[in-house]
Amino acid sequence: MQRITFFFLFFATFSSVFSQNTLGTLLNTEDSFSGYVLFSPRTSDSNKNTYLINNCGEVVNQWSSTFPLFSTDYLMPDGSLFRSVIDNQSTLDIPGNTGRIEHLDWDGNTIWALTYSDTDFSFHHDYVVLDNGNILMLVAKRRTLQESLDNGRDPATMAVNELYEECVLEIEPVGTSGFNVIWEWNSWDHLIQDFDNTKLNFGVVGDHPELMDINAGTNFGEADWWHSNALSYSPELDQIIISNRNGNEFIIIDHSTTTAEAAGSTGGNSGMGGDIIYRYGNPQTYDQGDENDRKLFAQHDVQFIPPGSPNAGKIMIFNNGQGISFTRVQIITPPYDAVNQNYTYTGGAYGPDTVDWEYLDPDDQFNFFAPFLSGAQELPNGNVLICSGPDGLLFEVDENSNTVWSYQSPVANSGILSDGDDPATEQTRVFRALKYGLDYEGFDGRDLTPQNVIENNPVDDGCLLLSTESFAIESAIKVHPTVTNEFIHIDTQLNEYTVELYNIHGQLLLSDRSVDLLNISEYSTGMYFLKIINDGRIKSVKIIKSN
């Protein structure tokens, strides 16, 4: 009993001094953007709450639901909440098939809600609330085998006898559950193919980047051949981004058209009707490149960066990296011609060739890999909030890729975890997260009194703000890997420092000076604590010795 008690006392002391909590706010520095983070854990029935938390991880508001949450949430300027929840009434096989949008007031009362989902169609993934209160939303519709063949699809590429058409609907909410369709765009009005010359849409794919090749894609066996997963709108340009994950590209269409013009190739500010006015990521889809020309790999959350951020007007992309096993968050400047209200294209692949900014793990690019879900947001101070969706890790980086704030969602399918639990052994997914500044008008007149943190049995105070000096040593020393059966690397430009290794009982096992490589192969499997000391400053890292 005495030995167990000592372990918990040591662990608690080590944790509180050296920030070894596993859940909630893991890092909180004075360089982070002051605000509130909105997110919905993507769990089954264990927890159906959308949370608004401060930088300390304390809840300032939450909204419950009777439906499982999807995690596409927006806090409106009036303090109300739009969110997507799962009420799929269709038989479409689409991961991310949500079906329902809810609009709630600050106190959780329903203002309006719509399930737009039936046997052969469904709202899915993403939507945008416009300034006039209308909603743009992604909708998938079933197309039959015959309809697919009539549009030139190669039957050899159809393992199932249907395809899904991606559409964008603009609806006007009416009453508490009604709507009017205001505008509509359907992707199958803009197809081309070079497989069947008996069809009306037969043509040279490479000569028509404004059209979508019905035989392009990387998942020919699936009905969900586009798998659109993000929608973004620029009110300044009156344009819409659609991210097509399975094509490894995103496209931009003109929203200034009428519905009739959106079905054709003329009209609108661009003069191109509903045709594609810009595309980026994979020129293979329009026969203008090969695999080496690909820029995007199963991307998510492609968005116009809004006014108020340093890179406003540019485009941010969460480039998941499926197929290359590392993830990047990138910002690009598309070749937009403001005079002609269109994008410059002179043949070949659409530019740009290079990105303006990107984040990837600064120590080892393969340390950061989120193969699905996920998103990012540029904040007004230039920092970027990143949501690593598969593991529910939210972290904020500055323009130099230093992590200045991080938060691990404690909500798993099994329930709310306790601090000290290993989230890697649970499913703690989050699709996206957004951060709102303290001065956001949606907070005017609202009670933002901090409540408890979400995690059970917290061992740390997430409001213990790291000073710039304390953060300096965090940034100046990189330790990797933290799970190993042999070597630990210490990367730093510091000349003098002490390295100490402790077991879970607080026993000092090793002490050395200014080394950059430790061999722990002789130690038993289990958990250890590595402490690095420089001029009175301390960095601590939890190490797992594997078999």
Q: Where do the protein language model's features map onto the residues?
A:
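Histidine-/acidic-rich catalytic cores in large beta-rich domains
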Residues: 20-466
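C-terminal outer-membrane/trafficking sorting elements
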Residues: 15, 54-55, 469-547
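Generic extreme N-terminus detector
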Residues: 4-5, 423-426, 513
